């Protein structure tokens, strides 16, 4: 069947929820058991099994790695029944393997889907991330800005002092200069050991999480 069959996101959303649910349940059995690889493999197996039940012509564009690095859900792998719309898929069956193994919060199952050709085929490299909460002006902060400028811009629009801003950053040596620059503004930093997808999501509800911005690579 042609891969140009119309893409209906509402029709696929329940199927994707099932895919994510089964991957999460499979990895949950390994919470706190100190085995990152087993937790990840359980999630991969479950996600792949469920994806292959969906009526899609799916191609993994962001996955577990290149074909020679990952036996399943590798970049370029075709999934689904082979009928239905052609789709691109970005996934991480278990984002936060260390968090899972240590029974720590913020491990997630992540999957996104779009029409064929709609997703960037990104290589396995560090990419800059920047997120703020809702309600701010478009373009208020950008990747081109120094970290301190981002904090000042956000504080100005929020109507508060930089000291009232909290930034979430992944604790890695490569971020040390950024951490120092943010702290120089008076802003506080919530360092996380893993799980930067969750860190980005925390920005969506700053009144609950206390996090105003995420930045890092």
Which residue stretches match the model-derived regions?
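N-terminal subdomain of lithium-sensitive/metallo-dependent phosphomonoesterases centered on the IMPase/IPPase/PAP
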Residues: 1-90, 152, 197-198
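Short gly/ser-rich anion-binding loops that grip negatively charged ligand groups
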Residues: 33, 37, 97, 140-144
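Solvent-exposed alpha-helices and their adjacent loops that cap or buttress functional pockets
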Residues: 52-53, 78-84, 92, 100-104, ...
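Short basic, glycine-rich beta-strand/loop surfaces that mediate nucleic-acid
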Residues: 79-80, 109-112, 210-216
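DPxDG-like acidic metal-binding loop motif
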Residues: 84-95, 99-120
């Amino acid at each position: 069947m042609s891969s140009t069959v119309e893409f209906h996101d509402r029709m696929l959303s329940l199927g994707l929820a099932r895919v994510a649910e089964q991957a999460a349940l499979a990895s949950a059995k390994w919470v706190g058991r100190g085995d990152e690889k087993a937790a990840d493999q359980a999630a991969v197996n479950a996600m792949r099994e469920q994806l292959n039940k969906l009526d899609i012509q799916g191609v993994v564009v962001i996955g577990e790695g290149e074909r020679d690095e990952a036996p399943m859900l590798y970049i370029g792998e075709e999934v689904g029944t082979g009928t239905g719309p052609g789709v691109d898929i970005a996934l991480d069956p278990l984002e936060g393997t260390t968090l899972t193994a240590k029974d720590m919060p913020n491990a997630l199952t992540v999957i996104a889907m779009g029409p064929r050709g709609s997703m960037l085929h990104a290589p396995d490299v560090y990419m800059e991330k920047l997120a703020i909460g809702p309600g701010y002006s478009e373009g208020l902060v950008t990747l081109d800005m120094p970290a301190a400028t981002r904090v000042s811009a956000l504080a100005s629009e929020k109507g508060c002092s930089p000291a009232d801003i909290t930034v979430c950053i992944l604790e890695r040596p490569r971020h040390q200069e950024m951490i120092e620059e943010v702290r120089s503004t008076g802003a506080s930093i919530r360092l996380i050991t893993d799980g930067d997808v969750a860190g980005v999501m925390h920005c969506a509800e700053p009144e609950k999480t206390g996090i105003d911005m995420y930045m890092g690579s």
